[in-house]
Amino acid sequence: MNQVMTIFLVLGVIVYSVESSLTPSSDIPWEKCRHDCFAKYMSCQMSDSCHNKPSCRQCQVTYAICVSTGCP
């Protein structure tokens, strides 16, 4: 079950990345907010702290909280 969630999250990240690169950048606040949250998520995933599954799970949780509470 956890692997399935991870696969869907990774696919979502890939789709979001492709969509972000294909669409012209806009000044819509929620798009910028989601982009900022995603940038933080990618930074977390690439960091040394994400060397085991629990640490990487925290990156996912932090991203979800960022989007749900910080973006309009």
UniProtKB/Swiss-Prot annotation:
Expressed by acrorhagi. Residues 1-20 form the signal peptide. GO terms for cellular component: extracellular region; nematocyst. Disulfide bonds join C33-C71, C37-C66, C44-C59, C50-C56. Keywords: Disulfide bond, Metal-binding, Nematocyst, Secreted, Signal, Toxin. One of its GO terms (molecular function) is toxin activity. It is found in: Secreted; Nematocyst. Toxin that is lethal to crab. It interacts with divalent metal ions (zinc and nickel) suggesting it may function as a metal ion chelator to regulate metal ion levels or as a metal ion transporter, or that its function is modulated by metal ions. Is not active against any of the voltage-gated potassium and sodium channels tested. In addition, it does not show activity in bacterial and fungal growth inhibitory assays as well as in hemolytic assays. This toxin interacts with divalent metal ions (zinc and nickel). This suggests it may function as a metal ion chelator to regulate metal ion levels or as a metal ion transporter, or that its function is modulated by metal ions. Belongs to the Acrorhagin I family. Has the structural arrangement of two alpha-helices stabilized by disulfide bonds (CSalpha/alpha 4(S-S)). This is U-actitoxin-Aeq5b.
